[in-house]
UniProtKB/Swiss-Prot annotation:
This is Cytochrome P450 monooxygenase cyp1. The lineage of its organism: Eukaryota, Fungi, Dikarya, Basidiomycota, Ustilaginomycotina. Its cofactor is heme. It is an enzyme of class 1 (oxidoreductase). Cytochrome P450 monooxygenase; part of the gene cluster that mediates the biosynthesis of the glycolipid biosurfactant ustilagic acid (UA). UA is a secreted cellobiose glycolipid that is toxic for many microorganisms and confers biocontrol activity to U.maydis. UA consists of 15,16-dihydroxypalmitic or 2,15,16-trihydroxypalmitic acid, which is O-glycosidically linked to cellobiose at its terminal hydroxyl group. In addition, the cellobiose moiety is acetylated and acylated with a short-chain hydroxy fatty acid. Its EC number is 1.-.-.-. It comes from Mycosarcoma maydis. It is a single-pass membrane protein. Heme binds at C572. Disruption phenotype: Results in complete loss of ustilagic acid production. Induction: Expression is strongly induced under conditions of nitrogen starvation. Expression is positively regulated by the cluster-specific transcription factor rua1 that recognizes and binds to the specific 5'-T/G-G/T-C-G-C-A-T-A/T-C/T-C/T-G/A-3' upstream activating sequence found in all promoters of the UA biosynthesis genes. Belongs to the cytochrome P450 family.
Length: 640
């Protein structure tokens, strides 16, 4: 069937035909001139010769049709040239010159033409060449990362960088300490999907990133994408104006007036419920999980403070904590995603993804119930609103917020807010209480110092009044407060974090160059064990480091050295709440009870032998239960 030339032969053949005609005309002209043999020897015969590798076709106007063979066409052309008079050219010489050109042209053209009929061959060749290129460019780092010989760190594998290390490493925090000791500050790793990570676990570099160049370092879209299905657009995951709005609204609850009107009373009520539970366990001789009890306490008190709801986690302790279990699992999976670039695909099919979807459903139901109940309450009130003098919780403040164009927050935005605040209000404080209690129960000097402070308060203020600590004076309880601070130094509630650079930068004091898109990784857990920062006894648990031994006054370290409450514009809003909560609860428990650590054996509970293992998560929980047995104190003299 006859077809148009541009359809049949394609761009390559059409171009060669055009070149063919050009050289044909030039050849005619030169053959008519005398003594042009040398020009023929250097003439480009490739357009003629390449016609041999296409199906021979005759040219009729703008249509190609099957025609004579290559040799027939060439002989016809030579005869025409020789028959026009002038110097005659021997066909043999032309073919001899053409054959040399043919040797260079034929292999490449054969591959090109044959490839049209073998797309798989084209794909395989392209894949091979592409792989060679990628291996050459990324022979020691992950794809997408610039090679940085100026940075020290473990050598990566081609294309995947340090991914195998990340997958095999079951103790990433300890590894950070090791890497810093071996490669120094600013050591680097590369991971597919994440890019280049630079360890900046130094106070001056963290201050540069979190304060001096705050606007240049963000959580980033990738961080947000990994967290979105659970934490949404909350304060923990967001940047820019969205983060500013949430911080501004949330800050209104953490005022002195709020502490006196809401927070103090709520915490005292829940401390009394904890006391009742432990007394029941003590009378029954029951061994119980103290870490689990702390989680119930912080969840109950925070939900009351933030949302004015009693979820009865303390008044009905035997009821399954479905929300807590689901939320804990979700955080564990979110943390795993940082070293699994394929998590979106994997979670569609594996068991982790199935459990994650179930956990998200439970978490979603919990937050939906809180928001919808408050919406119905507001609708029932109609135009009436809470008087200015009445109690307003965090949810009230966020529901009252209006953007510059008058828009209120949607239900989904309110639910995102709830979950982000839940991490800050529930998880971090409960974990700090657990680690602090373990150190108290395994270090008699720490235990006795706190017990002495408690007894002094009870003796001065009376058995009943001495149990309650006013917000105005809680910082005077230095034994408990310094033990809490030392606990956070070695067991920070957020042990690791990242920031992504928006523009190129240079870290101060001889620090490395930072490229746009690089991730700054810092670990408060590693910094707490660094002798350069905390002295040769950095790994020892010493609450006395927070007190001036000569004056007895508290020592205030820089927020970028004692970084467990974060620093700069993102300094923790709830640090006063957490500190007061810990001081008040520890005071209540150890004024009434003696606690004994029960070691159920390796792998079953936190024991005496070594510091308990932690669970890899967004926060820093103990991996195993903190099992204890309580006995009632008959009198103040019954100390350890």
């Amino acid at each position: 069937m006859r077809q148009r030339a541009d359809v049949e032969v394609g761009p390559l053949k059409s171009g060669l035909l055009f070149s063919y005609m050009q050289n044909f005309c030039a050849l005619q002209t030169r053959l008519r001139r005398p003594s042009r043999t040398t020009e023929l020897d250097t003439m480009d015969f490739k357009p003629f010769l390449t016609l041999q590798h296409f199906r021979p076709q005759g040219f009729a106007g703008d249509v190609l049709a099957p025609g004579a063979s290559y040799n027939q066409t060439w002989n016809t052309m030579a005869s025409k040239f020789n028959g026009r008079g002038g110097n005659r050219v021997e066909t043999g010489k032309v073919l001899e010159a053409a054959s040399e050109s043919l040797k260079e042209t034929v292999p490449l053209l054969q591959l090109v033409v044959r490839a049209r009929h073998h797309p798989l061959l084209v794909f395989l060749v392209g894949l091979f060449l592409g792989t060679i290129y990628l291996l050459y460019r990324y022979w020691d780092c992950a794809v997408g990362c610039e090679r940085r010989p100026d940075l020290k760190g473990p050598k990566g594998l081609p294309l995947i960088g340090n991914l195998m290390w990340a997958l095999k490493n079951r103790d990433p925090l300890s590894y950070q300490v090791y890497a810093q000791q071996k490669y120094g500050y600013g050591n680097t790793h590369t991971l597919p999907g994440l890019g280049r990570l630079i360890d900046i676990s130094r106070p001056d570099w963290i201050e540069h990133v979190q304060k001096i160049k705050f606007s240049n370092y963000v959580k980033g879209e990738q961080f947000h994408d990994q967290m979105r299905d659970v934490l949404g657009d909350g304060i923990f995951t967001s940047d820019g104006e969205r983060w500013k709005m949430q911080r501004k609204v949330a800050s209104r609850i953490f005022t002195v007036s709020s502490f006196k009107a809401i927070i103090t009373q709520t915490i005292r009520e829940d401390c009394a419920l904890v006391e009742q539970l432990i007394e029941t366990y003590a009378r029954q001789g029951t061994v119980f999980n103290l870490q689990e009890l702390y989680f119930k306490f912080t969840l109950s008190s925070f939900v009351k403070i933030a949302f004015s709801q009693d979820i009865k986690s303390l008044s009905e302790p035997d009821r399954p904590d479905t929300f807590g279990d689901a939320f804990n699992y979700a955080q564990k999976v979110l943390d795993m995603r940082f070293v699994q670039p394929w998590w979106k695909i994997a979670e569609r099919f594996n068991e982790t993804g199935r459990k994650m979807r179930a956990a998200r459903k439970i978490v979603e139901e919990f937050t939906t119930n809180i928001v919808e109940a408050r919406r119905k309450e507001s609708e029932a009130m109609g135009e009436k609103s809470k008087p200015e003098s009445s109690r307003k919780d965090l949810l009230d403040l966020f529901m009252a917020y209006r953007s510059s164009d008058g828009q209120r927050l949607s239900n989904q935005q309110l639910k995102d807010t709830i979950l982000n605040l839940m991490i800050a209000g529930r998880d971090t404080t409960a974990e700090a209480l657990s680690w602090m209690s373990w150190h108290m129960l395994t270090k008699p000097d720490v235990y006795d110092r706190i017990r002495h402070e408690i007894d002094a308060t009870l003796e001065e203020e009376g058995e009943q009044a001495g149990l309650e600590i006013d917000y105005d004076v809680f910082e005077q309880h230095t034994a408990k407060l310094t033990t809490f601070q030392e606990t956070l130094r070695l067991h920070p509630s957020i042990p690791k974090n990242i920031r992504r650079a928006l523009q190129d930068d240079v870290l101060p004091n001889g620090g490395p160059r930072v490229r746009k898109g690089d991730l700054m990784l810092y670990s408060d857990w590693a910094m707490g064990r660094n002798p350069d920062i905390w002295g040769p006894d950095a790994c020892e648990f010493k609450p006395s480091r927070w007190t001036d031994q000569e004056t007895g006054s508290s020592i205030k370290y820089s927020q970028f050295q004692a970084h467990f409450f974060n620093g700069g514009p993102r300094l923790c809003l709830g640090q006063k709440l957490a500190s007061y909560e810990v001081v008040q609860l520890i005071h209540h428990i150890f004024a009434k009870f003696d606690l004994e650590l029960i070691d159920l054996g390796p792998g079953r509970s936190a024991g005496f032998g070594k510091v308990p293992d932690y669970l890899n998560s967004l926060t820093h929980p103990m991996k195993r239960p903190l099992m204890v047995k309580a006995t009632l104190r008959c009198c103040k003299e019954g100390t350890r």
